[in-house]
A protein has these predicted regions:
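Bacterial N-terminal signal peptides that target proteins for export
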Residues: 1-9
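Bacterial signal peptide processing site
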Residues: 21-23
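Alpha/beta-hydrolase superfamily serine-hydrolase fold, recognizing
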Residues: 25-32, 36-82, 89-362
Length: 362
């Protein structure tokens, strides 16, 4: 009887040990799978332009935390892609001094800072570009986005006014959009004193700034203010509230912008659910785009916002607006302004500057 009991107990122990070993093995496999790069993300990584990858690798080395996991005040302290560009330039032995322009001058538009860039060449009166930086209405400022205004001032032969705006969540929608429109009206009113031509004022923006540049064009039409002569929209935010487009699905885990970050930005900026249906915020929900200024729309392949940027370009075309649309493969959100280290960024900057020059010459 004892022998049988001992044998039974030993058998039970052996079965339990095998089960535990199997569970541990399964747990290890699950852990390994969780830490591995998702197949879709790995596929997007394989499409990266080598120069773009170098910037993203450098950004990763700066040790920033995920923006979407942080309070806004902490998110604003994280390294930006512009920091990665400067770090990479240092490693390459390149000068990190800003691209020279004719001159710069810091101003105030209401209570918001602004920086005015004059071109090195050309003669008065210059055309003007009112530029709005990116950052999801939450992070970044005119200092972070210094490279683009310099490139455009130089290459388009225009005065560029980089206009700051109030940030969320301290200031909810439509605060930033109202500030953007106020900056545009300030440019019209002060163009002559800056040495510019008030009849040749364009708007331009990147990401959230591209969204606001599009909205400013709508607001000018609605309020019967002189409309911009042109709008340059670089990977504009198309809407808040929906994150299920083809490019959102394909680039949900992309860097430096992913789906979770866009949800975070919109959550911080939107004050009430119905804001998400406002065409000034969700430009792809606009019902009437007829009569808006001609546009250049730039998108990039590895970017959650690519589909919406293309959608808005198509909507403008369908409304009879003259549109120049170009998508850049192998690069990511924020590539524009990286012309010192990414050739495709240099090409995109030249494309926008050329289109602006053409608009100003008419």
């Amino acid at each position: 009887m004892k022998t049988t009991l001992v044998s039974t107990l030993l058998g039970m122990v052996l079965v339990f040990a095998i089960a535990c070993s199997s569970d541990a093995s399964r747990a290890k496999t699950i852990a390994n799978d969780a830490s591995a790069t998702p197949p879709a993300a790995a596929d997007r990584q394989s499409k990266l332009d080598p120069q773009m990858k170098a910037v993203l690798d450098e950004l990763a080395s700066l040790g920033g935390k995920p923006i979407e996991s942080l309070p806004p005040e902490e998110a604003r302290k994280q390294p930006a892609p512009a920091d990665a560009v400067k770090s990479l330039m240092k490693k390459k032995g390149m000068s990190t001094e800003p691209e020279p322009v004719g001159k710069t001058e810091d101003r105030k538009i209401g209570s918001n800072p602004a920086r005015v860039y004059w071109p090195k060449e050309g003669k008065k009166p210059y055309p003007l570009v009112v530029y709005y930086h990116g950052g999801g209405w939450v992070i970044a400022d005119i200092n972070v986005y210094d490279a683009t205004p310099r490139a455009i001032a130089d290459q388009a032969g225009a005065i560029v006014i980089s206009a700051e705006y109030r940030h969320a969540p301290e200031h909810k929608f439509p605060s930033a959009h109202d500030d953007a429109f106020a900056a545009y009206k300030w440019a019209l009113a002060n163009a002559k004193s800056l040495g510019g031509d008030p009849k040749k004022v364009a708007v331009m923006g990147e990401s959230a700034g591209g969204n606001m540049a599009a909205a400013v064009s709508m607001m000018a039409r609605e309020q019967k203010v002189q409309m911009p002569i042109y709008q340059a929209l670089v990977y504009p935010v198309g809407q808040c509230g929906r994150y299920d487009s083809k490019s959102y699905n394909e680039n949900a885990m992309a860097k430096p912008l992913n789906k979770a970050m866009m949800e975070y930005f919109c959550k911080n900026y939107v004050s009430k659910p119905e804001d998400q249906d406002n065409p000034h915020l969700s430009i792809v929900k606009a019902k009437d785009l007829k009569g808006l200024p001609a546009a250049t729309v730039i998108t990039d392949e590895i970017d959650p916002l690519m589909s919406e940027g293309k959608q808005y370009a198509d909507m403008l075309k369908d409304a009879g607006v003259n549109v120049e649309y170009k998508n850049y493969d192998g690069v990511t959100h924020e590539f524009f302004g990286m012309g010192t280290v990414v050739d495709k960024a240099k090409d995109a900057e030249a494309k926008v500057a050329s289109d602006l020059r053409s608009a100003f010459s008419k």
